[in-house]
Design a protein with these regions (language model features):
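S-adenosyl-L-methionine
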Residues: 1-37
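Conserved SAM/SAH-binding beta-strand->alpha-helix loop
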Residues: 71
């Protein structure tokens, strides 16, 4: 079976990432890899629930942690959980393409939709120098990664253009 055929057998919400939640162990690995710390303003785009921002604030002591997701039910459930746990984080119900991420220093961005990626790369390019964009499985299209611990990848603003897909993959 070809990979394309296999992918067609998977549920659309799984492929889109809509129903995928990163395990806590994975989130912690990603945060260690990115050197997330007390001076960071962390954004989890497509957060799904409060786990990522909860770990960022409680264990990595970030200055600020914000989760954004377009699924109202998931955000409301996450808000209920953080209120019960008395955690000082922010959850926003919004399309990430419309969100204000201008004060971010570290962003976790794991999307597969090409339109969303293209739109967000434009936003990312306007962020402060040294802002880290963390992706999983692949770097931002057409840019060289700054740091790789596969499957985790970091691109830093300003992005470095790749001359070819081969250069991007070999970096």
């Amino acid at each position: 079976m070809k990979i394309e055929e296999y992918l067609q057998t998977l549920p659309k919400n799984l492929l889109s990432g809509e129903d995928v939640q990163l395990p806590e162990k994975t989130l912690k690995e990603i945060f260690k890899f990115s050197n997330l710390g007390k001076n960071d303003i962390f954004f989890h785009l497509g957060c799904n629930n409060e786990k990522g921002i909860e770990i960022a604030i409680n264990e990595f002591k970030v200055k600020k942690a914000i989760g954004i997701d377009n699924n109202l039910e998931k955000i409301q459930n996450a808000q209920k959980n953080i209120k019960e746990k008395n955690i000082d984080v922010k959850l926003i119900h919004q399309n990430i393409e419309e969100s204000d991420i201008s004060d971010a220093t570290v962003i976790l961005f794991w999307f597969t939709d090409e339109k969303t990626i293209k739109s967000m790369v434009k936003k990312f390019n306007k962020l402060k120098p040294e802002t880290k964009i963390i992706t999983i499985w692949g770097p931002l299209p057409n840019y060289l990664p700054d740091k790789v611990n596969f499957p985790y990848i970091i691109n830093k603003v300003p992005f470095k253009k790749a001359e070819s897909v081969q250069e991007q993959l070999l970096s």
